[in-house]
Amino acid sequence: MVKKEAIIKAVNGLHVRPASTFVKKAKEYSSEITIESDGKSVSGKSLFRLQTLELSSGKKLLICAEGEDEEIAASELAELIESFKE
């Protein structure tokens, strides 16, 4: 399992539009993707579950990937989270 930390830089947090982009990208990987924040852990491949984390601007989260492409998945998804600006 590979874990990468990311900080939400988007002014409006991880609202529906960037969250759906994240989920779409996460589904491209064969690895299991899990997002952890504030002691909660949810599937990174579920928009509904991701929204339950209430990921606001400045919040730290942990992207966990387990599977064949775990290293690239965790790295690219962490970069994606930090690339969102709105």
Curated annotation (Swiss-Prot):
This is Phosphocarrier protein HPr. General (non sugar-specific) component of the phosphoenolpyruvate-dependent sugar phosphotransferase system (sugar PTS). This major carbohydrate active-transport system catalyzes the phosphorylation of incoming sugar substrates concomitantly with their translocation across the cell membrane. The phosphoryl group from phosphoenolpyruvate (PEP) is transferred to the phosphoryl carrier protein HPr by enzyme I. Phospho-HPr then transfers it to the PTS EIIA domain. Coiled coil: none annotated. PANTHER family: PHOSPHOCARRIER PROTEIN HPR. GO terms for cellular component: cytoplasm. Residues 1-86 form the HPr domain. Keywords: Cytoplasm, Phosphotransferase system, Sugar transport, Transport. One of its GO terms (biological process) is phosphoenolpyruvate-dependent sugar phosphotransferase system. The active site is at residue 15. It comes from the Bacteria. Belongs to the HPr family. It is found in: Cytoplasm. Gene3D superfamilies: HPr-like.
